[in-house]
Amino acid sequence: MDAAIQYILYFAVLVVLAVPLGRFMAHIMDGEHTFLSPVIAPVERGVYRLLRIDAAEQMGCRRYLASVLVFSGIGLVTLVALQALQSFLPGNPQHLPGVSWDLSFNTAASFITNTNWQSYSDETTLSYLVQFMGLTVQNFVSAGTGIAVMFALIRGFRQVKEQGLGSFWVDLTRTVLYVLIPLNLVFGICLAAGGVISNFQPAQKAELVEPVAVQPNADGGWSVIDGAQIEGDTVKVDGKVVEGARVVTEQFLPQGPAAPQVAIKQSGTNGGGFFGVNSAHPYENPSAFTNIIEMTSLLLIPAACCFAFGIGVKNTKQGKAIFAAMFILLVIFTGIIAVNEHAGTPQLADGGAVNIEMTDGQAGGNMEGKESRFGIASSSTWSAFTTAASNGSVNSMHDSYTPLGGFVQMLQIALGEVVFGGVGCGLYGMIGFAILTVFIAGLMVGRTPEFLGKKIEPGEMRWAVVLCLATPFAILVCSAIACMVPGLADQLNNGGAHGFSEALYAFTSCGGNNGSAFAGMNCNIPWINVMLGLEMLFARFMPIIGTLAIAGSLAKKGKVAESAGTLSTTNGMFVFLLVFIVLLIGALSFFPALALGPVAEFFQMIA
């Protein structure tokens, strides 16, 4: 019962907060007066004067796209330079060295694309300056870019025989100033009050209560020695000295300005953690209070985008229909993960090896890789939310989920981040599927497809296909190439079906702009870093190109009057068709690959 209440609470809070935020975002898009205008409007005008931005400019789709690409390219080069020059810059109390060229490129590509894939452990790789001047800035502007492109698409549907889609620079400025900064100021204060650390102190060392004996392992790291007898600096097991063993007496305690960066990495669907284990770290997510704030903020803006879309196109029912389709998919996927994690596995229950019964004192089920302070309900919901969005943050280890739990995580990402997805990009990704749906429905009834009063013709259909298939293409092609490289197996912690799942998840995560990982694959080698970086760039900007092409084409068209034969795109039937098409495309694209990974592992588990 407690678990059921948690699931209901998380979904209810999301819906209640998303509706007013969506209404607010629609006002921001059109530059209307809001309760924040007296404070922020002077700053907005100052930014326009400083950067010589024409607030009244109307860009065509090509100029809008060029602005997006140039802005992102500048961010890529700047972030690579910051990492390479890290050792010469201030704000580096740990005196960390510069980052290698391949990891710098991978990280820069990851953060400008809103993916936040991390082939490194933050606290031992990047300085405070690089984190808050490089990564955090990109967390804001990459999220703002996605919302700006969504605004352009809305104007494409709304305009009648016009060329302009608005100004990218104005849309980006308004999004950052009115939405992202105020929202994350509130979230950051709440997280800091809840115990998330926020300082600029160097890492601290603390004495352990008891010393621990470790020895080198095959992976180049250290493993704890079971049954060790420590006598000074000497380690013995059963009376015999262990050669090469080391006695650890101190613990490394990372510090840093985590709270404000955690806020934007959640609300901007960025996902890159301040610490290596992300929001499973007690410094980043210490309690149930911070957990619900971080989990709610994770999907808040993507959900609000649905309502902003409805208001923006002057058809609130359409926004609600898109939201309903996304919400239904999310509930289904969350339910599948939750049922499998609460049930555990036959191997855990075999002969009473592990007590998987739910009691007042324990969560039961499959608790491997999960934090006891969160349990299965909060962990399962987070994993569903973070893979539905293009977020990728974690409060548990996805590599330790049951086979079907991992299957759902990968499937949600592989669908093309359309189950709410990233800020802005999730909405325009789902619109691509909506256009595909009305096209198929139009074929069935013999009518030219229409959507929101605009005829959908071959030009829009070609770009809608690009929008829907860019992510599957990137994931499957890159995964296939990687699997043909002989050295890939050496980078995996496991073999067989689960080893394949680890590799497939990595390329799925980067192709879906998600950033989460099974963490069973060493990706910090040059060829993998470069391949993943290129995949992230392709999977981010091809859908943007398709979206702006559709927006530009629709803006030039006139409105078509509704008739008795016009397909309604706001009723339950359309919602059902949209959900069906999303699942159909996902199944046709990915089931063969998923069958070799998590599905095969599931049948091995129950055999």
Over which residues does each language-model region extend?
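Membrane-proximal intracellular helices of multi-pass ion channels
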Residues: 1-607
